[in-house]
Amino acid sequence: MALKYKLILASGSPRRVDLLNQAGIEPSRLMPMDIDEAPKKSEHPRSLARRLSAEKAEAALAAIKGDITWKGSYILSADTVVAVGRRILGKAEFADEALNSLHLLSGRNHMVYTGVCLVTPDRKVRQKIVETKVRFKRLSGFEIENYLASGQWRGKAGAYGIQGLAGTFVQKMVGSYTNVVGLPLYETILLLTGEGFDVHSRWPEG
């Protein structure tokens, strides 16, 4: 079946691509957007996730302006923020940053917020914000040391990916699992189908 609309994913995250693939969606183009992700003064983590997802979508829209190839396409973006209270735990790039985040998360509840933004072919902007409460077990020094050695914390909000080794740290979770991975699948599909993107016709036949 010829599919009418193209989908640009304004992200380079393999996890978000995998989640879309799980739903039978293959993005037509990946466009990682290099924006300033620093929170504003006193900005709530929820507001940060919402703002950054919108800014990524806006940047992608500006990048394809005038390119007839992508005229009439959908643009999807997302941003995930991990926070303990109002303290935002950024993407860990160095081991000491990851260590600090793990000490904060150990034995505590934290929140994972993902803002999802969709720009439609007629350039309407639709957004959803999804939150999940996660509780880590109390981590031993041995667990932290070995997790740091694995390198799985690199580039991840809060220094962990629930789909990897850190999944063994999760004692309890309330809310969407895919939200913690990086793209709340249920809510994303609702956004797409609500704006005329035919998800189910993309499913493979057996």
Swiss-Prot record:
What are the required cofactors? Answer: a divalent metal cation
One GO CC term on file: cytoplasm
Question: For site (Important for substrate specificity), what residue positions does UniProt give?
Answer: R15, T80, Q163
InterPro entries to which the protein is assigned, alphabetical? ITPase-like_fam, Maf-like
GO MF term (any one): UTP diphosphatase activity
Reaction(s) this enzyme catalyzes, per UniProt: dTTP + H2O = dTMP + diphosphate + H(+); UTP + H2O = UMP + diphosphate + H(+)
What residues form the catalytic site here?
D79 (proton acceptor)
The answer on whether this UniProt entry bears the keyword Nucleus reads no
Query: Where does it mainly reside?
Result: cytoplasm
- Record key words, sorted: Cytoplasm, Hydrolase, Nucleotide metabolism
Give the E.C. number(s). Answer: 3.6.1.9
Q: Which domain of life is it from?
A: Bacteria
Q: Does the keyword Cell wall biogenesis/degradation apply?
A: no
One of this protein's GO BP terms?
nucleotide metabolic process
| Cellular localisation | Cytoplasm
Write down the NCBIfam families for this protein, in alphabetical order.
Answer: maf, PRK01441.1
Summarizing the function annotation, the protein's role is: Nucleoside triphosphate pyrophosphatase that hydrolyzes dTTP and UTP. May have a dual role in cell division arrest and in preventing the incorporation of modified nucleotides into cellular nucleic acids.
Q: Which family does it belong to?
A: Belongs to the Maf family. YhdE subfamily.
What name goes with this protein? dTTP/UTP pyrophosphatase
User: Which species is this record about?
Assistant: Rhizobium johnstonii (strain DSM 114642 / LMG 32736 / 3841)
